[in-house]
Amino acid sequence: MWAWCLMPNHVHLIVVPADTDGLRRALAGVHRRYAGIIHARRRRTGHFWQGRFGAVAMDEAHLAAALRDVSLNPARARLVVRAPDWRWSSTRAHLTGKDDGITGRAPIRERFPGFAQLLAAQPDADAFARLRAAESIGRPLGDDRFLARIERATKRRLTPRKRGPKPRTEADANDEGQLSVLSP
């Protein structure tokens, strides 16, 4: 787990699963156990987390925006004045370099050796908006090369297609008005 933040009504995670089913396997069990504990304490049932589970595959360029979002979320929500003061987050581990038993610090340290400067930098509103949009529609976030690589790996088209009806082809025009007869 590269980064995380447990908020009162939701959780943010930046994880890189080892295989295609790794994320589901890891989170399903955690969700069941944690929700079960809280429901038992509060003697309630029903949905536990706010909204649905959202996941965004992203390239390295968008990782910085995601890290800022996850790390600064408690301060933006006015739960603390400074993000490192929030106990239920990986932010402190990344800033101090101390092991918290949860956070994989090395991948972030390698990519962002100036983690404090990353958090202090002016927020990129466009990157944040792209991150939220990608999360809401479930599409990967990255440049054309990244998207092409993901499309090849998954054998699925991931880039949005043009809206509206498909353009007519010459074959469609030739078929128009012809009646097909099937005989037994």
Set out the residue ranges of the language-model regions.
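Short Pro-Cys-Gly-centered "Cys-loop" motif that presents a nucleophilic cysteine in a tight turn
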Residues: M1-M7, V16-P184
